[in-house]
Amino acid sequence: RDPEMSRGLGDVYKRQNLYNPEFYLLAYANIAKSQGSMTQGVDGQTLDNMSLPRINRIIESIRNRTYQPKPAKRKYIPKKNGKLRPLGITSTDDKLVQEVVRMILEAIYEPTFSNNSHGFRPKRSCHTALTQVKKNFTGVTWIVEGDIKACFDNFDHHVLVELLRKRISDEAFIGLIWKFLKAGYMEQWQYNCTYSGVPQGSGISPICANIYLSELDNYMQEYKEKYDCEPERRRTTREYERASRRYRKARKALMGAEKSTPELVKEFKDSRREKMSQHYYNPFEEGFKKIQYNRYADDFVIGVIGSKKDAEKIKEDVKIFLQEKLHLEMSEEKTKVTHSSKPVRYLGYDFKVIHSKNMKRCKNGDMKRVWYGKVFLYMPKEKWIKKAMERGAIQVKRNNDTGKEMWRPMPRKDLMNRSDAEIVSTFNSEIRGLYNFYRIAENVGALHKYYYMVRYSMLKTLAGKHRTNVSVIKKRHMVNGVLRIPYDTTKGRKYCEFYHDGFRKHSDGYDNVADVMPSYRKYDSRHTIVNRIKAGVCEICGEHADYLCMHHVRTLKSLKGRDIFEQKMLKMRRKSLAIIRYFITNFFLTFPSK
């Protein structure tokens, strides 16, 4: 490409994206939706008081290359295994710039990512990953469970930058990403440098992780092309051919007989059952090999149609590739080879390949062996029990005589200070959250046991709050078997109903396109936060002004209506207000100078 042309295209890209205030407003609208935007970084600022002058100052500092990210504030959150996961809370200005960088990187790399990658990508989730496993892993005999040790903490910065340079020629943009990688973090008021990894909690860490691990995706695609081997014509097994001849003979005899006899019917059914119980193809046929691959963030699984020796070799080859090319290490404890008939834990589900030869009668009356070789997804029993115990909804004790577990619903004292409608709403959201995650599991109906326990926990919580018993609560609020709690609004009395929609299994994890809000409803609105700040109209007094800023609160629930800001927010049912400097000065709100 001509250098002058490349430089010209780079200038256009910078004007349209990196130096464009409209792009920053779009990024601001994205991060404003998150409650994390109101979390303070090391500078003590939040998204509150965002304005166009503040955005223009950020753009100018990026243009003249004086922009310097602040170190992240380190916090620790508990992991499932009892250990702690470090999170980096970045400053508000850094969150905004990182969102801009994320959108640019996503536009460049998203079309090139593998279809087998599902983590941190638009319109993809754990459900799409599991649905792909269910569809593509049919008939696999061995499964390689892959886990990368401390993946996000061990990304090599130099390797990441070299990967970025393959697609991006703008060194200033890469330099900006390098600054974020080297920004460091504050812990116990002490600054610490970062020599590797991308901080979890950073706006660019998910896209950087996918760019880094897409090399593994590409490697597995090349490996699959070399490994897969399928003969032009696969031979049927001798057992199946023999059973087929017996079935055809029995069927011909039954159809040709003037009158069916019990012996002919029995022979026909037995021969059909024998035929359906045999393999059509030999699953261990010499020369027939295939692998399937699926990744979500740093977790991946590889399905192998082949021998255990093949699976062990694939595991070792992947380990060597990660060490030599990406400078990452696989966890020896968590990375293992498992037979497909045994449950494999992946993304909170258990899955295994069914080897049952049982048959099922279809709608047209034919008998089919519908399960053999299929992948089934299961909800682990301990998951919903653990959730209920963590929330204090049940108490599990073991009977000393029989050794059996005794489950007892318990009132939740942490919810008793809330209103009745809030208590029911909290239980509803917890039930729906668990069901929505496990809705594609074969045994999702097992949540009825969870529902029974949680329902009585909710009734006991209401009874404990009102110092009565469960029978009184039922008699007071139960209507046609559904518990309804009344609450008053400005439009009259309404009712909050306890969840009663059941736990129907969904066929796959892909959302219905019909449920997606049309773009003209989603974006083309004068009430969006971007249009409100650009309109230049103060939402307190209605005056036009060039200098508007956005005032934010974390939740509407925390507002008491003590001043004009809170009264207006409660009236508009919004967590943000576009206001002018006059009100900021008079109400002692901090605001950055022009």
How should these model regions be labeled?
Residues 2-13:
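Single conserved hydrophobic/aromatic residue that forms the stacking wall/gate
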Residues 31, 60-83, 92, 96-104, ...:
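Reverse-transcriptase-like RNA-dependent polymerase core
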